Amino acid sequence: MAAGLFGLSARRLLAAAATRGLPAARVRWESSFSRTVVAPSAVARKRLPEPTTQWQEDLDPEDENLYEKNPDSHGYDKDPVLDVWNMRLVFFFGVSIILVLGSTFVAYLPDYRMKEWSRREAERLVKYREANGLPIMESNCFDPSKIQLPEDE
């Protein structure tokens, strides 16, 4: 019921907009629940054609094709010599400096999450326990004699 009223009021709104010369959107809406379709009426489709005008691009004498002057242009400068030098500088700093020095920096970063240190510490502890005749691993992580438990109540 409500969807039908919505469709009716939408059609009236589109027709009123078309008769008054207001711009109406050409929208077709279909409800997924009640299968109501709202489409612009035939009145909305009868508009006067808009006047057509010839549009022509202004040709500025400043606009020039860089590829006519320099077919190997890289887009850095209008002058071919500066264009080549700017391209060489960009690629030198981009490839040589960033990639080479960047990968060197990453390679010499400190131990991430201390993985190497924990491995060395475990090897040192295993050597100490083997030298003193202790088991390599114990079930107790802490010495039970040093732990103070609360009294039973």
Curated annotation (Swiss-Prot):
InterPro entries documented for this protein: NADH_UbQ_OxRdtase_ESSS_su (IPR019329)
Subcellular localization(s) per the UniProt record: Mitochondrion inner membrane
UniProt main location, coarse: mitochondrion
Transmembrane segments: 89-109
Residue ranges, annotated region (Disordered): 49-72
Keywords: Electron transport, Membrane, Mitochondrion, Mitochondrion inner membrane, Respiratory chain, Transit peptide, Transmembrane, Transmembrane helix, Transport
Topological relation to the membrane, as annotated: Single-pass membrane protein
Coiled coil start-end: none
Presence of the UniProt keyword Transit peptide in the record: yes
GO cellular component, one term: respiratory chain complex I
Quaternary assembly: Complex I is composed of 45 different subunits. Interacts with BCAP31.
PANTHER family tied to this protein: NADH DEHYDROGENASE [UBIQUINONE] 1 BETA SUBCOMPLEX SUBUNIT 11, MITOCHONDRIAL, NADH-UBIQUINONE OXIDOREDUCTASE ESSS SUBUNIT, MITOCHONDRIAL PRECURSOR
Role of this protein: Accessory subunit of the mitochondrial membrane respiratory chain NADH dehydrogenase (Complex I), that is believed not to be involved in catalysis. Complex I functions in the transfer of electrons from NADH to the respiratory chain. The immediate electron acceptor for the enzyme is believed to be ubiquinone.
Family the entry assigns: Belongs to the complex I NDUFB11 subunit family.
The protein, known as: NADH dehydrogenase [ubiquinone] 1 beta subcomplex subunit 11, mitochondrial
Source organism per UniProt: Pongo pygmaeus
